[in-house]
């Protein structure tokens, strides 16, 4: 199956493993909840049904926090959807507090630990050119 869009997640390289997994899950929930990317439910041989997942592959990159802020600035000028996760969200425990915490910072002052992007392949690839794949 060929897609004209691409999904990429960028994680700050100094995060603990549990943080990387947590941030990736939250960022993908934002993309999956607002974009038409979810496939059909899965059925095993016993006909047990499981929830559907993204139809598209998801590519994970790593970066410094500073470079992530530069990426966000550029991404805001392109036709891509963006989801973010900031350092402060590790200390909040619900959506209302999460949104309030993000609202305390100007865009260029966000303490980014993760960014999720979805858009046309060529735009997303250009934005992430030179970013290392996560290891």
What do these predicted regions represent?
Residues 1-135:
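Positively charged, small/polar-rich N-terminal and surface patches that mediate targeting and assembly
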